[in-house]
Amino acid sequence: MQSQMYVPPLSKLNKYIIILYVALFILGKILLSNGINLSSYLALTSGGIKSGLIFQLITFPFIDTQFITVLFNCLILWFIGSELENKWSALFYVKFLGVVTYLPGVVFLLMGLIIGKSMNFVPYFGLNGLNLGLLVAYAMIFSERTMLFMFIFPMKAKYFCMLLAGVEMYMALSGNAYSSSWMHLLSMGLAYGYLCYMSYVARGGSLMAYKAKMDREKMKGKLTLIKNEEEEKPKSSDPKYWQ
């Protein structure tokens, strides 16, 4: 029996993201043919923020320059993102996207402001980080499901995610300090950490409860059992042997 690939319905939120993403890609190509580089205005750069282009903090995920990247990102949003949005609520899905997309952007911007001129116009853009975060979430929830690496090689979701993390790590280490792969790895780490924390909260935990638990454990470690030596000494009247 041949296995059939499950295609989830495209969710409303992901449909809007894909429409905006593709529209800006097409607009960027049209403007580039007329000598205008749209990504230089909408991609995130510390130089752009210093120049007053604050909107870059919002627009940077929706800009991309390569057709194949746009295609794969749209497919992941459809196949992976839609299933996760349907499993979660739309509100939780939006929060997750915000964490894995915009927090790395803020970190990238802070790096640019700290490093200075050499990073002023190094851009950060695209949905790669977001989609890697979605794949981490998918691997955590559906770890035993089979996915097709490069649409050819079947492997379990958890191993597929590990492979992608390894590829990003290799690209980060073989590139320069400004490589966007570092931000993609951060997106993956944030996805894992956020879901672990939200799972802990769903079970009734909180940061305050965790701190209180750690404090109790530390207090237990400081407690020492003190024996009363006088009580341990046998009385002369006590029998020395029991039969």
Where are these regions (language model features)?
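Hydrophobic, membrane-inserted alpha-helices
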Residues: 75-79, 161-171
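N-terminal TM1-TM2 helical hairpin plus the immediately adjacent luminal interfacial "cap"
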Residues: 7-124, 175-183
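Membrane-interface micro-motifs in multi-pass membrane enzymes
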Residues: 114, 118-143, 154-157
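Juxtamembrane/interfacial segments flanking transmembrane helices
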Residues: 35-37, 142-152, 197-207
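C-terminal transmembrane module of polytopic alpha-helical membrane proteins
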Residues: 1-12, 109, 165-243
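Membrane-helix interface "capping/anchor" motifs
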Residues: 86-91, 141-158
